[in-house]
Regions:
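Catalytic core of IPPT-family isopentenyl/dimethylallyl transferases
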Residues: 1-76, 184-288
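Noncatalytic linker/hinge segments flanking ATPase motor cores
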Residues: 121-131, 152-157, 228-235, 261, ...
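Short, conserved catalytic or adaptor-binding loops enriched in Gly and charged residues
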Residues: 102-107, 178-182, 276-278
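Short, surface-exposed helix-loop/turn micro-motifs enriched in polar/charged residues
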Residues: 123, 143-147, 230-233, 254
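N-terminal phosphate/diphosphate-binding loop that engages ATP/GTP or pyrophosphate donors
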Residues: 10-34, 45-146, 154-168
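Conserved, function-defining core regions and hallmark residues within catalytic/recognition domains
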Residues: 86, 150, 269
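Phosphate/Mg2+-binding loops and adjacent switch elements
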Residues: 137-203, 207-211
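Gly/Ser/Thr-rich helix-start
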Residues: 39, 98-100, 150-153, 162, ...
């Protein structure tokens, strides 16, 4: 008989994450990657930073030393670091438009942010390669890797074992050579917010970013040689502000169309994550 897909409620129910149990699962190698995902304006970065801070605090107090587990060779826990899964935060100089507030990370180390100049080409295949290297390095130092972002395809590429040579996913029965360098036991946490609250946050955040100089940031990228067509291809803020700077939209039209586009984008992100659940991925949703 074909495998029955799980029944997914229209809205996920929030949970309370048992941090101690999650830590024990990591030490026992039942978890080898924590994933914090969610739509834009859902508070996922803040949650990931808070989680990493809790892990760091416990490690500093030595609470993980001698932690009882089932494994004879438990995974060490010296702290936590964050790997970004955002397709646009990889670019230098694209800060306000991508919500790249590096001060939010505090003293938590982060990776795969500001690794390329704006206008450069980057894709899911390169992300998977970069993730392999960073994930292995973090774990080799006894740190807990936390993947945080809203780019669903990037998240799937490293947690479902996408094989870009054959264009198929290796999530089912992948062998050691196929999955080499990728996590086998990810633990998914989703940041949950209602559509109404999310859209209100998006609108407030957009107005704040416009006041903070988002238009000037994108004008500077164009002046520095970033091709307009490339910025437009990045979508959302970079698309509509570039069109405004080219004289194709009024300021009012730019703001209105951009807000609508971000609302729709957040909805598509949530649809992607619910689709992951329908395919069998267990996401633990939390209210932030």
């Amino acid at each position: 008989m074909p495998k029955r897909k799980p029944v997914i409620a229209e809205l996920p129910a929030p949970e309370e994450i048992d941090f101690g149990a999650l830590a024990r699962e990591y030490i026992d190698s039942l978890v080898d990657l924590i994933v914090v995902l969610g739509p834009t304006a859902s508070g996922k970065t803040r949650y990931a930073v808070q989680l990493a801070g809790e892990i760091n605090a416990c490690a500093a107090l030595g609470l993980f030393e001698g932690c009882p587990g089932r494994m004879t060779d438990p995974a060490p826990v010296n702290g936590a670091e964050i790997i970004s899964a955002d397709s646009r935060q990889v670019y230098k100089g694209m800060d306000i438009g991508t919500g790249k507030d590096l001060s939010e990370y505090g003293d938590i180390p982060y990776h795969l942010i500001d690794i390329l100049p704006a206008g450069a080409q980057y894709n899911v295949f390169r992300f998977q390669q970069d993730f392999r290297r960073v994930w292995a390095d973090i774990r080799s130092r006894g740190m807990v890797p936390i993947l945080c972002g809203g780019t669903g395809m990037y998240i799937n590429a490293v947690t479902a074992g996408y094989d870009f040579t054959s264009k198929v996913s290796l999530s089912a029965g992948r062998g050691p050579s196929e999955a080499e360098g990728l996590p086998r036991h990810p633990y998914f946490i989703g940041t949950l917010v209602s559509r109404e609250v999310r859209n209100e946050r998006i609108d407030r955040r957009l107005d704040a970013r416009l006041k903070e100089g988002m238009v000037e940031e994108i004008r500077g990228l164009l002046d520095s040689g970033a091709p307009a067509e490339t910025l437009i291809s990045y979508g959302l803020e970079y698309k509509y502000v570039t069109l405004y700077l080219q004289g194709q939209l009024s300021y009012e039209d730019m703001r209105e169309k951009l807000a609508t586009a971000i609302h729709q984008f957040a909805k598509r992100q949530m649809t992607w994550f619910r689709g992951m659940e329908r395919s069998g991925v267990r996401i633990h949703w939390v209210e932030v």
